[in-house]
Amino acid sequence: MSEPARLISPEKRGEDLDITLRPQSLDEFTGQAEARANLKVFIEAAKNRGEALDHVLFVGPPGLGKTTLAQIMAKELGVNFRSTSGPVIAKAGDLAALLTNLEERDVLFIDEIHRLNPAVEEILYPAMEDYQLDLIIGEGPAARSVKIDLSKFTLVAATTRLGLLTTPLRDRFGIPVRLTFYTVEELELIVRRGARLMNLPMTEEGAREIARRARGTPRIAGRLLRRVRDFAEVARAEAVTREIADEALTRLLVDNVGFDQLDKRYLNMIAVNFGGGPVGIETIAAGLSEPRDAIEDIIEPYMIQQGFIQRTPRGRVLTAIAWKHLGMQPPKEMEAAQFRLFQEDD
């Protein structure tokens, strides 16, 4: 994105890698109750049988804990954990180097697997299914096929764009897990746990204020907590109260629902320039000077989940909640137009 320092971006940053704040077991992990319960069963069953866990695919917006869950799974299985990402595996040799170094039942985590090179993906199929690598050595008439046996491993992959995965790859994951945005109550527990680990006194109201503005995303909650701590320490506050959190986040231009300036530009552009919509994603991307992928992956998911925008066959449309948040009145014809659009959407 053109604004990499955006405070509420769910994309990973160096400061987010603080392992002291990360849960170390499924019992410590807050939220995603159904996914955690199922993973516990699958892990226990694999351990009892002495087998590698089936391959796991995590699907969901960034910042919800896919990497953390993969690390916890390896820890609870009692095996090694290796991590990489789709764009990093440029050629078949890169993947072969990773796979041949795995020991029995190890966990290999591939983030952003939807960005995997298609040529590399072809090599991954037999590795996942038969625990074998089929490599072509040499070129031309001298080329020959070589089969390499692999240790039985577990591939844990993560994607924000399930639709970009090919069907053959998607079908090779025995355990698909969809992660959803967290509730304010779950995020409040995460914030309070983080504050305890930081030895930062905090009231329940202070924790809730941070949680309300964290866009349903633990990674953002942790980042906001660190910045609020800075304000509290400089102000020599005895504890982080609701007032301290509100002042800090307001000064950081994060509003009461977790929107920043880019979110407001998005909503304002649709409201002012296009009468509330419908407007196509390419037009929005051009108007904001942001890549389409960034808008679809980073900006829109939380807005859609919270009911601020509606995706229709003809484009994005602001809802009544969005107009109220902007402090604007929708055009008089908007209600009837939206009704027709939603009928088409059905």
UniProtKB/Swiss-Prot annotation:
SMART domains, A to Z: AAA
Catalytic activity: ATP + H2O = ADP + phosphate + H(+)
Region entry Large ATPase domain (RuvB-L), spans: 1-182
Gene Ontology molecular functions: ATP binding; ATP hydrolysis activity; four-way junction DNA binding; four-way junction helicase activity
Annotated binding of Mg(2+), by residue: T67
Entry's EC annotation: 3.6.4.-
The name this protein goes by in its record: Holliday junction branch migration complex subunit RuvB
Gene that this polypeptide is encoded by: ruvB
